[in-house]
Amino acid sequence: MKFRVDDEVIVIAGADKGHRGKILKVDRDKDKVVVEGAARVWKHVRQSQKNPQGGRLNKEMPMSASNVMLVDPSTGKPTRIGVRYLEDGSKERFAKASGESLGQIAPAKASKAAS
């Protein structure tokens, strides 16, 4: 999965279609993301020492990563994410629509010839 925490995304499917928000959490094992303000549900909480009031909590639930698209920082429109290698051998994410860099993923690997 190419999403990272704090990426701005737009929901493209489901009840919250069209909602924009930042990614709060990424679960790579289940291929799910938690988007700020989207997929909100009421969670009923029993009284306990940790939560003496009890009651209902409104919280964001995870949604499938296939239901969101990254918002291109330069155009503000949804775009796919690509990965490319730079000249120094490091990997970076980029917006496929505009080609703008979204940040480095991995540093350059040390060559085996140097050792």
UniProtKB/Swiss-Prot annotation:
Recorded GO CC terms: cytosolic large ribosomal subunit
GO BP terms: translation
Key word ATP-binding present: no
Tagged with keyword Cell membrane: no
Disulfide bonds: none
InterPro entries tied to this protein: KOW (IPR005824), Rib_uL2_dom2 (IPR014722), Ribosomal_uL24 (IPR003256), Ribosomal_uL24_CS (IPR005825), Ribosomal_uL24_KOW (IPR041988), Translation_prot_SH3-like_sf (IPR008991)
Entry keywords, A to Z: Ribonucleoprotein, Ribosomal protein, RNA-binding, rRNA-binding
GO molecular function: rRNA binding; structural constituent of ribosome
Region (Disordered) residue spans: 45-77, 96-115
PANTHER family xrefs: MITOCHONDRIAL RIBOSOMAL PROTEIN L24
NCBIfam families: rplX_bact
Family according to the record: Belongs to the universal ribosomal protein uL24 family.
Subunit structure: Part of the 50S ribosomal subunit.
Role noted for this protein: One of two assembly initiator proteins, it binds directly to the 5'-end of the 23S rRNA, where it nucleates assembly of the 50S subunit. One of the proteins that surrounds the polypeptide exit tunnel on the outside of the subunit.
UniProt-recorded name of the protein: Large ribosomal subunit protein uL24
Lineage: Bacteria, Pseudomonadati, Planctomycetota, Planctomycetia, Pirellulales
